[in-house]
């Protein structure tokens, strides 16, 4: 009987110990969960609100100072793809002193400010640790000078107005009229197949936002068809190559009807 009683007491004691461990384990898990929640709330308040502003500023400033001493400071700026954007403009947007912490640079802000330049279509900015900022520019390429409402603009292949400073690009084709900026890329692309003809073309006028008139050297006017004007350009180029365009006293060539061309002389 004494052995049975002793055995029962041991079982009861073991059961009590297991129950206590379970309770302690559950309390521990709850405490950890509560600590995580409190920590998460604190982090959210610290990062996403104005609370602890002075502390944040102090910590960030010290982090920048430490990283600078460790060699993570701005010393080099690499710029690729720059052709027409002024380098000083880029450095001004960068707005950073040499030897300042490279982590202090706000890359998204730099990128957005650079995109404000009408020359820049896209830009990529990154850090190259420990001391370099890399800027890759994708500039808009001017293809023509567009005249509209007595104003002149450089335009790219999408018809986007880049700049009013046309002087450095005076060699580009001059296009005139409503919609001329949008359709200039197609015309320029076709004319580039015939360099001699492109060189003789002074102005391309968009008529009714449907088709083109070309004004050539020698006061010759060419009326192109609304659609499939490539054949008409090929015909004009052939005349030029055979020396039958600029010495025939032509005033106008009406090529709008692909089945019958009309020629007017002075």
Swiss-Prot record:
Gene Ontology biological-process entries: cell septum assembly; FtsZ-dependent cytokinesis
PROSITE patterns: POTRA
PANTHER family cross-referenced by the UniProt entry: CELL DIVISION PROTEIN FTSQ (PTHR35851:SF1)
GO cellular component, one term: plasma membrane
Positions of transmembrane segments: 32-52
Keywords: Cell cycle, Cell division, Cell inner membrane, Cell membrane, Membrane, Transmembrane, Transmembrane helix
Primary localization class, coarse: membrane
Family assignment from sequence similarity: Belongs to the FtsQ/DivIB family. FtsQ subfamily.
Protein name: Cell division protein FtsQ
Residues in compartment: Cytoplasmic: 1-31
Source organism of this protein record: Rickettsia typhi (strain ATCC VR-144 / Wilmington)
Cellular compartments annotated: Cell inner membrane
Function: Essential cell division protein.
Domain POTRA: 72-140
Residue intervals annotated with topology Periplasmic: 53-266
Membrane topology recorded in Swiss-Prot or TrEMBL: Single-pass type II membrane protein
Gene: ftsQ
């Amino acid at each position: 009987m004494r052995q049975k009683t002793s055995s029962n007491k041991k079982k009861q004691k073991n059961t009590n110990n297991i129950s206590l461990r379970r309770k302690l384990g559950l309390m521990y898990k709850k405490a950890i969960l509560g600590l995580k929640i409190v920590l998460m709330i604190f982090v959210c308040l610290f990062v996403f609100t104005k609370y602890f502003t002075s502390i944040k500023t102090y910590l960030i400033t010290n982090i920048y100072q430490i990283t600078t001493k460790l060699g993570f400071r701005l010393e080099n700026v690499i710029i690729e793809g720059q052709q027409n954007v002024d380098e000083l403009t880029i450095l001004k947007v960068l707005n950073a002193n040499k030897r300042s912490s490279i982590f202090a640079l706000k890359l998204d802000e730099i990128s957005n400010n650079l995109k404000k330049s009408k020359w820049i279509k896209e830009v990529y900015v990154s850090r190259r640790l420990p001391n370099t900022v890399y800027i890759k520019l994708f500039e808009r390429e001017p293809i023509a000078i567009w005249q509209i409402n007595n104003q002149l603009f450089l335009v790219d292949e999408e018809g986007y107005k880049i700049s009013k400073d046309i002087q450095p690009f005076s060699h580009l084709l001059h296009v005139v009229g409503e919609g001329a900026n949008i359709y200039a890329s197609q015309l320029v692309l076709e004319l580039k197949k015939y360099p001699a003809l492109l060189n003789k073309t002074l102005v391309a006028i968009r008529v009714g936002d449907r088709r083109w008139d070309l004004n050539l050297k020698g006061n010759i006017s060419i009326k192109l068809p609304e659609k499939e004007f490539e054949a008409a350009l090929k015909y004009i180029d052939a005349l030029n190559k055979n020396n039958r365009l600029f010495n025939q006293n032509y005033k106008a060539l009406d090529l709008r009807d692909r089945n019958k061309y009309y020629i007017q002389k002075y």
